Amino acid sequence: MPGIAYLGPEGTFTEAALRALQAHGLIPSTAPDAAGADEVTPIAADSTSAALAAVRSGDADFACVPIENSIDGSVIPTLDSLADGAALQIYAELTLDVSFTIAVRPGTAAADVRTVAAYPVAAAQVRRWLAAHLPEAEVVPANSNAAAAQDVAAGRADAGVSTALATQRYGLEALAADVVDEPNARTRFVLVGRPGPPPKCTGADRTSVVLQLDNVPGALVSAMTELAVRDIDLTRIESRPTRTGLGTYKFFLDFVGHIEDPPVAEALRALHRRCADVRYLGSWPTGDVVGAAPPPMDESASWLEGLREGRP
């Protein structure tokens, strides 16, 4: 059975996402000729970077990590870990609705709370609630939502922004439940493994790449044009520093379609020719079409294929 590293400890939203990926049959099997994994071995990691490092080292077959949320945007440690080091590939994604439990030790009242442990991504999603209900409390960083509950249980914080599961597991009580500033808060998680053949095209797919461009005028516009002229819907673009010098960046691109779609394949070839470096992060199913699907092979492609086969 595959070993899946995830942002631990037990009780995080990432563990819940891992279980949901398994329930939906989205975790590939490591056994030959098997369609999907019926059983998995969860491996708790201290950080998203550590979870991805476990895949690179072979200590885990896959990692389940958060990549984006609707409140605070991209999860930067995940992006940086995907862009640097040995190549990795995304095989599946899943989106969870997110709300938090404010966990406290039994008998603790709101007036007793002076410190609140919170994973930074979670803190951003409950900032207004904390300001309204615990205005005097200091927010201290935790390594994960479940680690925030552990900090409370160990007495390192008076309260923690955590999950209902972690609150129960660590013998705590809920000072407040279903806490979130935005009722439509959602987090997208991805399943990451070592490079291999991508999942089959479903018609509702996402492709992701990381581009490094030459430092010449119009380089980014030229790269984007390769998608635009093929009617490929770009759904996300984000820059991150290369860490090699000021003013140098890598660009993360998500777009609708699969490497098996002819327009996407053509665009990837063109980006490879045009850019200093292209890191392919994968093509995988999204479940629902997000954006406009790439156009089917048009009449001109059929005409060209006929010429190749001697049918003018």
Curated annotation (Swiss-Prot):
Site (Essential for activity): T187
Region (Disordered): 291-312
Assigned keywords, A-Z: Amino-acid biosynthesis, Aromatic amino acid biosynthesis, Lyase, Phenylalanine biosynthesis
Assigned GO CC terms: cytoplasm
One GO term (biological process): L-phenylalanine biosynthetic process
EC number: 4.2.1.51
An example molecular function term from Gene Ontology annotations: protein homodimerization activity
Top-level lineage group: Bacteria
Subunit details: Homodimer.
Protein's recorded name: Prephenate dehydratase
Source organism of this protein record: Mycolicibacterium vanbaalenii (strain DSM 7251 / JCM 13017 / BCRC 16820 / KCTC 9966 / NRRL B-24157 / PYR-1)
Protein encoded by which gene: pheA
